[in-house]
Amino acid sequence: MAGYLLGLARLKAALFNVTVIAVYVAQIATISSYPMRVTSSLVTAYTGAACNVTSYFYLATRIIRIQYSRQPILKRSHMQKLVALFISCCLLFALMTAFKPRTVVVNADSTNGDTLLYPEEKHFKNIQQLTFGGDNAEAYFSYDGQWLIFQRTQPKEGILCDQMFIGKIPKPGEKFEYKMVSTGKGRTTCGFFTRDNKHVIYASTHLGGDECPPVPDRSKYGNKYIWPLYPSYDIFMADLNGKIVKQLTNSPGYDAEATLSPDGTKMIYTSVKDGDIDLYIMDLETGEEKRVTNTLGYDGGAWFSPDGKKIIWRASRPKTPEEIREYKELLAQNLVAPTNMEVFVANADGSDARQVTAFGQANWAPVFMPDSKRIIFASNHEYKRGFPFNMYIINEDGTGLQKVSRDKGFDAFPMFSPDGKKIVFCSNRNNGGTRDTNIFLADWVE
């Protein structure tokens, strides 16, 4: 009996140590580079279970000492119930210790948004969530790979529609700090750093009014998903303190969706200046422009390849009389329906344009990968209902399709760091079941 009690005492001491360790791990998880709601919940449960089981072991030890003394105080039935409770607590503790508190939850069937990384996502490593709450989108690296620019809406902070923010990429364990570089007036979209990393460009409607421009009433268009092409959008250059130093476009109608060439000398953007939604390339030094596309349909979201020899973009190509009629009617109201888009590539001057995807649905946010040969893009083509969106890799000739991300909501806007070692993207994952879209950074694994 003495040996049995000694064993219980040792188990009790061991569990006390486990409890202390669990509390320590919980504190580490709170300040670590893994700011996950799920991880915190597991650590809390782990700690609570350890504390409870330690208490039960202590109680059991005391009761057994008394029970087996010459003056038993519990009936046999009561003792059996206590032992059953004791065993249940042990089983609970064993189950809780099966989870490692700092390991990312990888439940691929999760529907509540509390998943940071899925087991099939083999290309992502050391994933970090940078923003928490609101709608954060189109996060893009600076040329030196040290900063991100992105657009953000967060009514809780008084940001009623997208404004432009920049932030330095944090070291592991540090918080992502960011500041607004747009005027705070109107709506902004599609920010990009300049080659000197001292300025940014972005499109803004602030010259058309201080308030957020109205969102289209989709009920008037059969509840279809539509994008507004606000005529007051123009493209501006600002310093990192938010002071506008130059207005880059000034044509009537929509001018937006700008990115820069690898050498920083050319800007490709979307405009309706010639009556359709087309791509234009501007020499930032001289201001000279060239129209790149001239086919009926929306052309936008264009990027140069890392080697500067090609461009890539998303486009719609209405073909039937009904499709053409609908496209023109929406365009006349400064609207476009982005529900049927494909990925296109061409030489940097717009020659030899060719279609890469032919999946139907919405295939968009394409960029070349670091090798300037493969492409990563977002698509909902696997789902007839039009959702979710995931990211895919495809060769320039349309072969070798590979699914990269697995969230049940929205994964899009991928961009690689200049050295090709990291990827940034925006996603609905790990949002606690809300509609928040946040920014995620990960090491890229080939």
Language-model features: locations:
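A flexible loop/linker signature enriched in serine peptidases of the S9 family
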Residues: F132-D135, Q151-M164, S182-T188, A203-D234, ...
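Cysteine-centered motifs
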Residues: C51, C89-C90
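Blade/loop signatures of beta-propeller domains
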Residues: V104-K125, Y233
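Residue-level detector of Asp-centered blade-edge/turn motifs that repeat once per structural unit
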Residues: Y143-D144, R195-D196, P262-D263, P306-D307, ...
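Beta-strand-rich domains and repeat architectures in extracellular enzymes and scaffolds
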Residues: D114-L117, N126-I159
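Short loop/turn segments that connect beta-strands within beta-propeller blades
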Residues: I169-P172, D239-K243, D283-G287, N347-S351, ...
